[in-house]
Amino acid sequence: MIESFNQFGSSLLGGFWPVVWNLIKIVALIAPLMGCVAYLTLWERKAIGWTQIRPGPNRVGPWGLLTPIADAVKLIFKEIILPTAANKGLFLLGPVMTIMPALAAWVVVPFGPEVALANINAGLLFLMAITSMEVYGVIIAGWASNSKYAFLGALRASAQMVSYEIAMGFALVVVLMVSGTLNMTEIVLGQDRGRFADMGLNFLSWNWLPLFPIFIVYFISGLAETNRHPFDVVEGESEIVAGHMIEYSGMAFAMFFLAEYANMILISALAVTMFLGGWLPPIDSVVFNWIPGWIWLGLKTFVVVTMFLWVRSTFPRFRYDQIMRLGWKIFIPITLIWLVVVGLWIQSPWNIWK
């Protein structure tokens, strides 16, 4: 069907069709993503409410389902106030620089064997490079606001994000070693072979089982990378009010939160792709194979995102020195040790990734 539509568009628009086709694919990717981001805010409030034995939002629309729309309307019509002493150009650039990497990184995420906006050979490298740019938006926002609270929040954010990017990067390098490729589609397909996969137990052949400590390091680093609880000292309300976002209002303020929730979904989707078999069904059966791969990817991503929310409703906030100690003295040494262990494992007769 997609190929027929592509051929029809090519015959209709000729040389302009590739540009139009890419724009259609971008809109088809970004529009559902923004819808997921909006309703993730509702799911977070509902999940935390149930954890605390209360109903959560239930006033706007049936069962509170229109709450994200009400929030969006409220923020759209709020004024964006520019502080007098702020650098106005950089002040407005900060939110854009924060949300753009969270959206651009999705172009290499595979939703199926041949379903990706850009199935490039260096997909994992591209994703790691593009997501590392988000820290610049936070630094620009903190610097341009000309506020001591915003500047302190930006300093905290940059140090925390850079620290945990190292641990997360090493964790992904371990997956790269066992997969032998940077192509994210091939990384998923590589998890569909082995003794357990031959038995139909696909979920036991995924990377989470042999690389379980690395999976845990990746998940916790993802919490810190997205400034989620218990690593949310960047916007610690009791210390620096709202951190680098303190001077923002309206849609400029909303873009920071859109970026945070989009990054949560991206980190979760990357965890699913690297460790949980991507679009592959957990069991090789007629019923499970009938379900489209993008639904499996979405369900697994939903479970991982819910783990983010569960952590928020369970653990207290860490002190900043505890966060730095965890990243530099525990996670980075663990990932370095596992790099050596996996390297020796691959060269041994017990290599399970052949």
Curated annotation (Swiss-Prot):
Membrane topology summary: Multi-pass membrane protein
GO biological process: aerobic respiration
InterPro entries in the record: NADH_UbQ_OxRdtase_su1/FPO (IPR001694), NADH_UbQ_OxRdtase_su1_CS (IPR018086)
Cellular component terms per the entry's GO annotation: plasma membrane
Keywords for the protein's UniProt record, in alphabetical order: Cell inner membrane, Cell membrane, Membrane, NAD, Quinone, Translocase, Transmembrane, Transmembrane helix, Ubiquinone
Top-level enzyme category: translocase
Enzyme Commission code: 7.1.1.-
Localisation: Cell inner membrane
Parts of the chain that traverse the membrane: 12-32, 62-82, 89-109, 124-144, 162-182, 203-223, 239-259, 263-283, 291-311, 326-346
Catalytic reaction list: a quinone + NADH + 5 H(+)(in) = a quinol + NAD(+) + 4 H(+)(out)
Single GO term (MF): oxidoreductase activity, acting on NAD(P)H, quinone or similar compound as acceptor
Family: Belongs to the complex I subunit 1 family.
Alphabetized PANTHER family for the sequence: NADH DEHYDROGENASE SUBUNIT 1 (PTHR11432), NADH-UBIQUINONE OXIDOREDUCTASE CHAIN 1 (PTHR11432:SF3)
Oligomeric and partner information: NDH-1 is composed of 14 different subunits. Subunits NuoA, H, J, K, L, M, N constitute the membrane sector of the complex.
Described function: NDH-1 shuttles electrons from NADH, via FMN and iron-sulfur (Fe-S) centers, to quinones in the respiratory chain. The immediate electron acceptor for the enzyme in this species is believed to be ubiquinone. Couples the redox reaction to proton translocation (for every two electrons transferred, four hydrogen ions are translocated across the cytoplasmic membrane), and thus conserves the redox energy in a proton gradient. This subunit may bind ubiquinone.
Record-given protein name: NADH-quinone oxidoreductase subunit H
Organism: Methylibium petroleiphilum (strain ATCC BAA-1232 / LMG 22953 / PM1)
Gene symbol of the encoding locus: nuoH
